[in-house]
Structures are given as C-alpha cells and as structure tokens.
Curated annotation (Swiss-Prot):
SMART domains: C1Q. Residues 24-82, 84-130, 134-193 form the Collagen-like domain. This is Complement C1q and tumor necrosis factor-related protein 9. Multimers (predominantly trimers). Interacts with ADIPOQ via the C1q domain to form a heterotrimeric complex. It is found in: Secreted. Residues 197-333 form the C1q domain. Residues 22-194 are annotated as: Disordered.
Amino acid sequence: MRIWWLLLVMGACTRSVFSQDTCRQGHSGIPGNPGHNGLPGRDGRDGAKGDKGDAGEPGHPGGPGKDGIRGEKGEPGADGRVEAKGIKGDPGSRGSPGKHGPKGSIGPTGEQGLPGETGPQGQKGDKGEVGPTGPEGLMGSTGPLGPKGLPGPMGPIGKPGPRGEAGPMGPQGEPGVRGMRGWKGDRGEKGKVGEAPLVPKSAFTVGLTVISKFPPPDAPIKFDKILYNELNHYNVATGKFTCHVAGVYYFTYHITVFSRNVQVSLVKNGVKVLHTKDSYMSSEDQASGGIVQELKLGDEVWMQVTGGERFNGLFADEDDDTTFTGFLLFSSS
C-alpha cells in the first residue's frame, strides 16, 4: 500500500511543475498518511494449468484393513534358510498323554520305600513262559492197590492144536438158500440173414390222352396213358382193374373238365360205389374223388361216364390230365 501512496505523491508533484512555468523544483515533501483501502478488484480469469508439483511427503500408515477372501492354496515355497536359534520361549501348556514308549532298561534298586496303600486288584496277566525243570523229588511211598481193570483186547490166534478123531456122521441138513443170480453171459454169434418176406404188391396209375378224351358214356373208360402198371393188374384193352391179391385197396381219380359237364362213377363188379359231378362254366375245371374198398380175388373195378354224352367232358392234353389210380394198402391173406 505504501508503494501506491508514493506513486500518487510523485504524480501530483509532476503535474504542479508542468503547470508553473517559472516554478522551481522544491524539496521533497513529507510523505502523507496512507489512504484508505480501495474496493476489492474483480476475480481474474483462470490461469493456465501449472506444472506438476513435487511429490508430497509420505502419509502416516493407515489402520489395518478387513480380512480379505481366502485365496487358493499356493505352491510349496523353497526351503528357507536355517536361521540362528532364537530365544527360548515360555513353557507351553501341557499336551495330551503320548503313546507308551519302549520298555526302558532296569535301573538300580532303590531304597525300600514306605508301604503304600493297597491298590485295586489288577487284570489277569498274560501266561508266563514255562520255567526250567526243577530237581527230581524224592520217591514217594507205594500207594494202595487199585480196582480190577477192564478186560484187555483179544490176543492173536494161537497155533492150531493136534487134529482130533473124526466124529460120527450127522443128520442130513435142510436145503440151502437159493443162490444169487449169475452174471450175464457173453453175447452169442450173429445168426444168418433170414429170407425176406414176400410182400404182396398191386398198384397202377393210368390217364387219358388227346385220342381218348371225351369217352363214350355207360361203358368202362379206357385209359390209354400208362404211368405205372408194372404188374399189369389194369387191363388197357378193357379199362378194368382185376384183383390178384385179396385185401384192402385205395382208389382215386383226378379229372379235368372242359366244354361239357361231367358225371362219373367208380364201379365195383357192376355196382356204382362213388359218384362225382361237375358243371362246366366257361373255363377249365378240376374234380376228384377217392375211396377205400376191400376186394376178393377176381373182383373188378373201373370208371365210367353216367348220364349220356352231355356229361362226358373229361379232357386231356399236354398241359391237363385226367388220371385213375389204385393200390393195395394191405392184404387179407
């Protein structure tokens, strides 16, 4: 503030010198009293950011923080150095009793102490080792006679004595018990092969051909296609089967129907024993029949169309057959 007052005084003197043309410069006046404080000036604009200040002094250590979360187990560290032995610590609290150590060596016999109080009876100890055999004792006196013992085991058989004289013949004994069955004897030699039995035979199978199809009615059908007739029991010329072996026979027929209706019968000695009828529709058809009959020697069996030519539609060609079969089941002789 003093600097401001000094500048004001010097300014006033300068103005008075320039205003007086003839005035001389006098001696400096006495400095005036300080003026009153002026009004505070307005805030200046923010200056540019200053340089970074020097680092402050380290603060005082803070208080201990809260315990953090337990971290994962770290890897084992390297073996530390063996430091010098530290100062002996205070005695720790008494630990739990340890296991029994090995038996120590027997110490010297101490002085006999005062008799202690009788303790509780201890547990039974382990069986001790057998001690050495003691010296033989003196022979005792003979004891009293004991009771009679049990009979001993039978001794060995003695040598046979001399043969005695023959005694008188005794009475005849009863018959003995029947003995056990003997062992099975060896198998005998194989016998000679016997003669084969004569089995009676009789069989045939015959059929129609293109020539013999549509046979005439009311007469034995002459089957001229021989499939089997080794014994010639079926006569192709007559169309009849003649019995040469008395017995039971089976007869069967299979017919193809074409262009006309069919009505056939199986005849035995002139008697019709089986009938088959089939009506022709528009294509080939099949029909069949079978029967078992007992025959005597000389009996005759055949097939024939019944009902006229309207019912003789028995057909045969390269692809279709009409057959008649008979054979012996078993003989009655």
